[in-house]
């Protein structure tokens, strides 16, 4: 049974039969409206964020499977801050400030997609993205907050979030 894969970037909860979906799925003979409804159902929690979606179609039976990826870290940060864009010159411009709790929340959302082995290193990866976007954390440069994590300043907060997991 031959399978075809279609990968697209869709705004959460706002897929429609037009491009890029319609033209990509049309030749595969699948019911495009059913695919759109399934994508919107699975991405509704990511409203306002671009989400990678993979549609796997069995070209014989016309059955399909929708797999939703995690939005890019930058999209989650922008959503948390309620902004449209990062800074044009991140070293000289600040577009927003996240709390350490928000950084940890994002790290938990992205954990499976990151190379990190624990929540602290995941948070440091998120801080790296903040730095490249012109986003401060707790009013400080994200590099400074990364050093504070290494020094143990945020250990109590990390322990609180790690206990919630158990």
Swiss-Prot record:
The gene is rpl11. This is Large ribosomal subunit protein uL11. Keywords: Ribonucleoprotein, Ribosomal protein, RNA-binding, rRNA-binding. The keyword ATP-binding does not apply. Belongs to the universal ribosomal protein uL11 family. GO terms for biological process: translation. It comes from the Archaea. GO terms for molecular function: large ribosomal subunit rRNA binding; structural constituent of ribosome. Part of the ribosomal stalk of the 50S ribosomal subunit. Interacts with L10 and the large rRNA to form the base of the stalk. L10 forms an elongated spine to which L12 dimers bind in a sequential fashion forming a multimeric L10(L12)X complex.
């Amino acid at each position: 049974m031959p399978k075809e894969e279609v990968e697209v970037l869709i705004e959460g909860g706002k897929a429609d039969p037009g491009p890029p979906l319609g033209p990509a799925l049309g030749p595969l003979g699948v019911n495009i409206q059913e695919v759109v409804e399934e994508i919107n159902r699975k991405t509704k929690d990511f409203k306002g964020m671009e989400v990678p979606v993979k549609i796997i179609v069995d070209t014989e039976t016309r059955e399909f499977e929708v797999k939703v990826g995690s939005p890019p870290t930058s999209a989650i940060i922008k959503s948390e801050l309620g902004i449209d864009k990062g800074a044009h010159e991140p070293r000289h411009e600040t577009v927003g400030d996240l709390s350490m709790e928000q950084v940890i929340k994002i790290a938990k959302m992205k954990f499976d997609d990151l190379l990190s082995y624990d929540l602290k290193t995941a948070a440091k990866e998120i801080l790296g993205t903040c730095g490249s976007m012109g986003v401060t954390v707790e009013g400080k440069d994200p590099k400074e907050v990364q050093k504070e994590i290494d020094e143990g300043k945020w250990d109590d907060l990390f322990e609180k979030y790690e206990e919630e997991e158990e």
